[in-house]
């Protein structure tokens, strides 16, 4: 749900706390009075099969700018107060995010490490000058967040009224070019100029002989531990404002993570470094009032130590049906599932089930699925749903 930058990937969000304003429903803004029907009359004809991100983003942000302009003109004192109260309630992250986005926009989208050193290094006088000069632009970004959180809150309440709980996904690492890293450089392993001293990835495996070089900055877990991992506690609380359960992506990184030199071109030269482990989850459980509404994404290089960490905190792991068809001993097959587990047909890395069946599943896989389900597989997506139930 986070705001995306270059590449449009939710795994490279511009903030771990903010919402994506591109998800704001413009028709609802007409209902709320921040746009008019005439504003939407010039809606472009979008391709219904493929997303043209450039066209969609430019048009939608233009409409959000129009809504901000109208809000400033017509909002009542009560509405202005409601907006201000919401901003105050999110003061732990919103001012930094809004200023970060305003400066980035003012500088043509430059990453923060390319900004003048006084802005890059958050010189107080430079930040004050930028805040005053870009006040309207920063206000627009605060307004977009208010719209997102207001609409998402309605959606979440509607789902709750129907007995539906929402599951969200939290990447373990954040993007280097994010307000989080810019505002809290002390929490990450960075050089004096703000660039990473080492980056995240995973080692070589069957699927990639050079591993995966993700490039995210790594946490300085020793610094995070000094205040009981408060930044992470705030992050999970923010996630749980939006969803009911959080899937922790790359759970194994909390036990040990793959550290790669920042100048490496592949992940081959990395090494395993111990993560915060049980101390971290103990702190999170305390911060979340004794609860851990989390799912452990326990895929990849999973060791007994990772499994022990997951089980010690009673976190459900994942069972992915598309990965199940290598033989009868495969632990993803339904008869091996355990009560404390979440069944997925596939993950965000997989083709949707129908596409997988049509284009990726080989003859042996299809035969095994048919044998396992004792019949012809005419609708593989429904077959997978039944297996997961």
Predicted regions located by residue number:
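Acidic, His- and aromatic-enriched active-site or binding-groove loops in soluble protein domains
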Residues: 9-36, 181-206, 270-281, 315-325
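A structural signal for short, well-ordered beta-strand segments and their strand-loop junctions
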Residues: 99, 165-168, 245-250, 295-298, ...
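Active-site-proximal loop/turn and secondary-structure-junction residues that shape catalytic pockets
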Residues: 2-3, 170-178, 213, 252-254, ...
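Conserved alpha/beta catalytic core and glycan-binding cleft of carbohydrate-active enzymes
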Residues: 79-82, 86, 187, 203, ...
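The substrate-binding groove and active-site-proximal loops of carbohydrate-active enzymes
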Residues: 45-55, 132-147, 210-230, 265-274, ...
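Substrate-binding/active-site clefts of carbohydrate-active enzymes
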Residues: 165-230, 235-238, 242, 257-273
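Active-site neighborhood of glycoside hydrolase catalytic domains
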Residues: 141, 148-161, 225-315
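Acidic/aromatic-lined carbohydrate-recognition and catalytic surfaces
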Residues: 1-185
């Amino acid at each position: 749900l986070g705001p995306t930058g270059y590449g449009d990937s939710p795994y490279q969000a511009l903030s771990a706390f903010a919402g994506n304003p591109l998800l704001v429903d413009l028709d609802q803004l007409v209902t709320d009075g921040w746009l008019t029907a005439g504003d939407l009359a010039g809606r472009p004809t979008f391709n219904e099969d493929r997303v043209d991100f450039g066209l969609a983003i430019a048009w939608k942000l233009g409409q959000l700018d129009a809504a901000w302009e109208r809000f400033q003109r017509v909002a009542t004192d009560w509405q202005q107060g409601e907006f201000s109260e919401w901003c105050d309630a999110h003061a732990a992250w919103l001012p930094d995010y809004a200023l970060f986005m305003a400066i980035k926009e003012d500088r043509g989208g430059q990453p923060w490490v390319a900004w003048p050193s006084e802005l890059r290094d958050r010189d107080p006088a430079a930040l004050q000058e930028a805040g005053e000069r870009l006040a309207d632009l920063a206000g627009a970004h605060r307004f977009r967040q208010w719209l997102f959180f207001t609409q998402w809150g309605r959606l979440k309440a509607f789902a709750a009224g129907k007995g539906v709980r929402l599951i969200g996904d939290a990447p373990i690492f954040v993007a280097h070019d994010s307000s989080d890293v810019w505002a809290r450089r002390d929490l990450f392993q960075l050089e004096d100029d703000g660039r990473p001293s080492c980056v995240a990835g995973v080692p070589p495996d069957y699927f990639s002989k050079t591993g995966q070089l993700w490039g995210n900055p790594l946490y300085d877990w020793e610094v995070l531990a000094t205040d009981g991992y408060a930044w992470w506690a705030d992050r999970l609380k923010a996630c749980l404002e939006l969803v009911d359960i959080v899937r922790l992506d790359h759970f194994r990184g909390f036990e040990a993570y793959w550290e790669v030199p920042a100048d490496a071109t592949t992940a081959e030269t990395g090494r395993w470094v111990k993560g915060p482990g049980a101390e971290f989850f103990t702190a999170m459980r305390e911060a979340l009032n004794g609860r851990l509404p989390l799912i452990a994404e326990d895929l990849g290089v999973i060791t007994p130590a990772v499994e022990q960490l997951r089980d010690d905190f009673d976190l459900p792991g994942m069972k992915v049906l598309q990965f199940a068809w290598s033989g009868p001993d495969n632990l993803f097959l339904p008869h091996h599932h355990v009560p404390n587990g979440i069944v997925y047909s596939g993950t965000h890395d997989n083709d949707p089930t129908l596409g997988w069946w049509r284009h990726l599943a080989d003859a042996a896989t299809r035969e095994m699925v048919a044998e396992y389900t004792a019949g012809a597989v005419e609708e593989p997506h429904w077959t997978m749903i039944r297996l997961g139930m």
